[in-house]
C-alpha cells in the first residue's frame, strides 16, 4: 500500500484526485493539504465538497505541516498554483517522493516561457530538464522511471492527443498551420470567485487569443506551429476542440481512422468515433478523450472532447501514477 499526499485538495481538480485515490486499491491518502491562508484549514473534505459526505471525511491540513510527514510518503500530487508547485517540487523530491505536478511549473523545457507567460522566474532549470511530461498515452516508458511527472494542461492534452498521430504519420500539409478552436467550461478557471466566472456574467466568448498559456506548451510538444483560439463556455466542465487541418493529397478517411487505431487501439482512455462526432455530454464526469473527424477534399476537421477536470487533470494524473508504480493503467479510474 502506497502512502500519498494531495496538496490543493480543496480545488476542483484536487477534489477529483481525492475521489480517485480514496477508492484506489493500492493507495492510502495520508494527508490532504491546502494553502497556509486557506479558509478550509481544519474543515472536513466533505464539508467543502458535499457530494462526498460519508464517502471521504478526511480533514484539511495547512501545507505548513507537510514537513512533519514527508518521510512516510511515497507519492505527492500537487494541484496548486504554478508558483506554489515551483517551490514545493524540490522539497518533496529531496524527501524521495515521486511527484505528480498538475501545475505548469515543470512542463516546458524553455525557462523563458515561465517569465513570459506565467510571470515568474524559474529557478530550477535542472529539474526542468529532468522532468517527464505526463501525456500518458505517449510517454509511458519515461513515466515508468520518472521521479517528477509534469502533467499537461487540459487544452494541451486534448489537442496533442488529436494531432500527434497525424504529425507522426506525416499526413498533414506542411504549408498549412492547424487551426484550433476549443471551448472550456468555467471550472477550467479554478474555484476562486471572479466576475468573469460568475453566473450572470459567463457567456460563450473567446479569450487570450495568441497569448494563452497553453500555446507555447502545445507548440513545444507538437513541434509545429498552431493557431490556438480558446473560448470560455457557459457550462461547468468539459472541453470540446475543433481542429481544422489540410491533408496531403490522396489521404482518405480510412487512412486517418487506421492512424488513430494504430496509436490508440490499446489505450483504454481514448475512444475513436467512426460514425459520430464527440460531445461534452459524452465525456462529462468521465475519464476519456473522445475523437472523431470529417474529411472533405483535402481538409480534415477533427473534434475532440474531454472532461477538463478528469482526462485534462485528475484522471490523467492517476493514470500516470498507475503507470509509474506498475498498476493497471485504469485502476480506480474506470
Swiss-Prot record:
<protein>
    <recommendedName>
        <fullName>N-acetyl-gamma-glutamyl-phosphate reductase</fullName>
        <ecNumber>1.2.1.38</ecNumber>
    </recommendedName>
</protein>
<dbReference type="InterPro" id="IPR036291">
    <property type="entry name" value="NAD(P)-bd_dom_sf"/>
</dbReference>
<keyword id="KW-0521">NADP</keyword>
<feature type="active site">
    <location>
        <position position="154"/>
    </location>
</feature>
<dbReference type="Pfam" id="PF22698">
    <property type="entry name" value="Semialdhyde_dhC_1"/>
</dbReference>
<dbReference type="GO" id="GO:0051287">
    <property type="term" value="F:NAD binding"/>
</dbReference>
<dbReference type="GO" id="GO:0070401">
    <property type="term" value="F:NADP+ binding"/>
</dbReference>
<keyword id="KW-0028">Amino-acid biosynthesis</keyword>
<keyword id="KW-0560">Oxidoreductase</keyword>
<dbReference type="InterPro" id="IPR000706">
    <property type="entry name" value="AGPR_type-1"/>
</dbReference>
<comment type="similarity">
    <text>Belongs to the NAGSA dehydrogenase family. Type 1 subfamily.</text>
</comment>
<dbReference type="InterPro" id="IPR000534">
    <property type="entry name" value="Semialdehyde_DH_NAD-bd"/>
</dbReference>
<comment type="pathway">
    <text>Amino-acid biosynthesis; L-arginine biosynthesis; N(2)-acetyl-L-ornithine from L-glutamate: step 3/4.</text>
</comment>
<keyword id="KW-0055">Arginine biosynthesis</keyword>
<dbReference type="GO" id="GO:0006526">
    <property type="term" value="P:L-arginine biosynthetic process"/>
</dbReference>
<dbReference type="GO" id="GO:0005737">
    <property type="term" value="C:cytoplasm"/>
</dbReference>
<dbReference type="InterPro" id="IPR050085">
    <property type="entry name" value="NAGSA_dehydrogenase"/>
</dbReference>
<keyword id="KW-0963">Cytoplasm</keyword>
<comment type="function">
    <text>Catalyzes the NADPH-dependent reduction of N-acetyl-5-glutamyl phosphate to yield N-acetyl-L-glutamate 5-semialdehyde.</text>
</comment>
<dbReference type="GO" id="GO:0003942">
    <property type="term" value="F:N-acetyl-gamma-glutamyl-phosphate reductase activity"/>
</dbReference>
<dbReference type="Pfam" id="PF01118">
    <property type="entry name" value="Semialdhyde_dh"/>
</dbReference>
